């Protein structure tokens, strides 16, 4: 399968999670890049110019909440849609994701069809 679709940046400190999401994305025809924490995500977002970012909430160095806030404050990256991923499905986490600027919120574990549908909804494709 040719992967010429939009580039998705996967930000998660867990290698297995990044590879699993990458496999889901490849199956749907998306390209993907990865970052291991929020700090690296800031750099990769500026250099790779992804169409969308999947952001884990809990990571070392800089968590996803802070990374999303900074990405949305930066004129160079504020236009990039973000989907926040977290193991916590509580309403307060959904509200926090919206407050920091995430465009969508998914609770882990994320099913492949659920992830693909949410990406397509956010990207309007």
Residue ranges of predicted features:
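Charged docking surfaces used in two-component/phosphorelay signaling
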Residues: 19-27
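C-terminal output helix
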Residues: 110-119
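Active-site beta3 strand of CheY-like receiver
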Residues: 48-54
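Short hydrophobic/Thr-rich beta-strand motif most characteristic of the beta2 strand and flanking loop
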Residues: 29-36, 44
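Receiver (REC) domain active-site loop signature in two-component systems and cognate sites
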Residues: 59
